[in-house]
């Protein structure tokens, strides 16, 4: 008989790059999770904007099981039907002409940055290698993507870092304009900075970035790893802004909990990537592709996307009511079901403590830095689940405030 698994085993056996919650989830259904002791949680964290259709969605399980009964993997020496169907769905639904599949958002961003460098080198020469990114961004944990992220806390211990990456202030076109020039090969930007505090870009900022990239023959990359696949109420956030990138990265919700990532590209950009210039062993495997194809089928409908906008209103209305009572937040911001509650000055730096109180009360939330409590629930979360979860969150806020004043 195997020994019982406990949270303490994590501290004994795992490389300690995470500090997970004190409880271990063991079962999920929809927007609810249960831990080893049977305690129920309403899940407003969504696996960090991954579980777009909640836990154990029956149609995703069916898609996975059906493919699992056929074959799992062949490697990139062969293609498969599920990945080709998935590619066509993404092409039909977006600006893209071609797709590269991988396993995560970091891999998708790595591929985008490599493509941008090669595109510039092939067309203009090796001097055109500069990448402009933004402070407080997050693009992944590879050495290339963590360097683009603009958060020294994630990169300072891994020097020397890749060169020719500079960081402008987000939503500040003058700051960006000072860095973008004819030696710039790409600008990479999140339409909403997720890890950086749930900060939406302004329309003018993204439009001006598009114009600057066109003027200097640089590619515009939208990192939609967190904002993509219905999260904002459009299939991809660029559709809100009327600004079309040259490259777009997507992952997280694309697999609904199954690891998958993708780089979407125009034909002009894609043609520089020839056989052997990039690759991955597992990318586009039939299991991931079958699940992602079903995710897109379920999410890319007017009913689902309009429902996200409606659910945004449910959350914002109730969070504002809660805030009127407890006075924790200076702002509630975001698009669709990516929502950030910004702590006011009296509670600065205490987002983690609030998230811990929330878990005790039976609701799971995220943070985005020390000052923002973040919500990224399933896109199909019910009104009853929203009400129950936010009632629990209100109880957590009440306990947090009373504890601080006692």
Curated annotation (Swiss-Prot):
> What EC number(s) does this enzyme carry?
2.6.1.81
Q: Which GO terms describe its biological process?
A: alpha-amino acid biosynthetic process; arginine catabolic process to glutamate; arginine catabolic process to succinate; ornithine catabolic process
Carries keyword Transferase?
yes
Reported cofactor(s): pyridoxal 5'-phosphate
Q: Which GO terms describe its molecular function?
A: identical protein binding; pyridoxal phosphate binding; succinylornithine transaminase activity
Q: Which of the residues bear the PTM N6-(pyridoxal phosphate)lysine?
A: 252
Q: Could you tell me which pathway this protein works in?
A: Amino-acid degradation; L-arginine degradation via AST pathway; L-glutamate and succinate from L-arginine: step 3/5
* Cytoplasm listed as a keyword: no
Q: Name the source's superkingdom.
A: Bacteria
Under the heading InterPro entries, the entry gives:
Ac/SucOrn_transaminase_bac, AcOrn/SuccOrn_fam, Aminotrans_3, Aminotrans_3_PPA_site, Class-III_PLP-dep_AT, PyrdxlP-dep_Trfase, PyrdxlP-dep_Trfase_major, PyrdxlP-dep_Trfase_small
Q: Catalyses which reaction?
A: N(2)-succinyl-L-ornithine + 2-oxoglutarate = N-succinyl-L-glutamate 5-semialdehyde + L-glutamate
Cite the entry's keywords alphabetically: Aminotransferase, Arginine metabolism, Pyridoxal phosphate, Transferase
Q: Which Pfam families match?
A: Aminotran_3 (PF00202)
Sum up the protein's function in the record's words.
Catalyzes the transamination of N(2)-succinylornithine and alpha-ketoglutarate into N(2)-succinylglutamate semialdehyde and glutamate. Can also act as an acetylornithine aminotransferase.
- Family statement drawn from the similarity comment of this UniProt entry: Belongs to the class-III pyridoxal-phosphate-dependent aminotransferase family. AstC subfamily.
Mind telling me what this protein is named?
A: Succinylornithine transaminase
Organism ancestry: Bacteria, Pseudomonadati, Pseudomonadota, Gammaproteobacteria, Enterobacterales
């Amino acid at each position: 008989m195997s020994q019982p698994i406990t949270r303490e085993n994590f501290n004994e056996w795992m490389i300690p790059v995470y500090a997970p919650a004190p409880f271990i989830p063991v079962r999920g259904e929809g927007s609810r999770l249960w831990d080893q002791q049977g305690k129920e949680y309403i899940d407003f964290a969504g696996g960090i904007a991954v579980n777009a259709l909640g836990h154990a969605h029956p149609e995703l399980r069916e898609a996975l099981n059906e493919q699992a009964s056929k074959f799992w993997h062949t490697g990139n020496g062969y293609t498969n039907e599920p990945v080709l169907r998935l590619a066509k769905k993404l092409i039909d639904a977006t600006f893209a002409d071609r797709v590269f599949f991988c396993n995560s958002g970091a891999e998708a961003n790595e591929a985008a940055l490599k493509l941008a460098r090669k595109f510039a080198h092939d067309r203009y020469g090796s001097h055109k290698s500069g990448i402009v990114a933004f402070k407080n961004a997050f693009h992944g944990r590879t050495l290339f993507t963590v360097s683009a992220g603009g958060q020294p806390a994630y990169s300072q211990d891994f020097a020397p870092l890749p060169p020719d990456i500079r960081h402008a202030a987000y939503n500040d076109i003058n700051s960006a304009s000072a860095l973008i020039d004819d030696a710039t090969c790409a600008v990479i930007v999140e339409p909403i900075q997720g890890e950086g505090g749930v900060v939406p870009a302004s329309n003018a900022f993204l439009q001006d970035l598009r114009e600057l990239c066109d003027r200097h023959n640089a590619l515009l990359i939208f990192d939609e790893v967190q904002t993509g696949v219905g999260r904002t109420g459009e299939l991809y956030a660029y559709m809100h802004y009327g600004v079309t990138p040259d490259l777009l990265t997507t992952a997280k919700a694309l697999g609904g909990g199954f690891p998958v990532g993708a780089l979407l590209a125009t034909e002009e950009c894609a043609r520089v990537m020839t056989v052997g210039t990039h690759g991955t062993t597992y990318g586009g495997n039939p299991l991931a592709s079958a699940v992602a194809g079903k995710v897109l089928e379920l999410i890319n409908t007017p009913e689902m996307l309009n429902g996200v906008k409606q659910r945004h209103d449910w959350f914002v209305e109730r969070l504002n009511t809660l805030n009127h009572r407890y006075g924790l937040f200076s702002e509630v911001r975001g698009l669709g079901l990516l929502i950030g509650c910004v702590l006011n000055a009296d509670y600065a730096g205490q987002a983690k403590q609030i998230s811990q109180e929330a878990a005790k009360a039976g609701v799971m939330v995220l943070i985005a830095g020390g000052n923002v409590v973040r919500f990224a629930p399933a896109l199909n979360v019910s009104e009853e689940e929203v009400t129950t979860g936010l009632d629990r969150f209100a109880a957590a806020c009440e306990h947090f405030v009373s504890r601080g004043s006692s």
